Amino acid sequence: MKLIAHRGNIVGPNPLEENKLEYIEAAIAGGYDVEIDVRCEDHQFYLGHDEPQYYVPMTWLVKRKDKLWIHCKDFKSLNIFSNSPIDFNFFWHENDKYTLTSKGYIWTYPGQSYCSNSVIVMPEVFDLQNTQNNDKISYNKKSFAICSDYVGKMI
C-alpha cells in the first residue's frame, strides 16, 4: 500500500510549508509519494493550493514524476499535462466523489466506497481528534493508497 503525503505533510497539516519544494523533497526522502497542487501561469508552473505560490521547474517535476500525484488546479495545467509525452500521474477535481487519475487510479473522496484500485483521500476527516492525539493510527490496507496529512503516523 502506498502512503501519499498530502502537500508534503507527514504528521499533520503545516500550511506554512505545504507545497514547498524542500518540504516535498523531505517527504519523498522519507519514502512517501506526495500529492502536490500545480497551477500554470504565464507558461510557468507553480505550486500552491489556493494560488500560485512557489515556482517549480518542469525538470523538477520530471525528475520526481514517479513519486508525485499532481493535482491540476486549473485548466492550463490540466491541458499541458494531458498533452505531455511524459507519463505524469495527474488529475483534476473539485467536489467529486470519485476522480480517475491519468494512470487509472480512483481518487476517492472521504467516506465513499472504495476498491483495490482506490486512493482513499483524507480518511482523518472522520476522526481528526483521534488522529491528532495518537502517535500511531491504523488504516485500511485494502485500497491501493491513502493520501493524508498524517501518513507518518500510519501503521
Residue ranges and their predicted role:
Residues 1-155:
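Phosphate-group recognition and catalysis centered on beta-loop-alpha active-site segments
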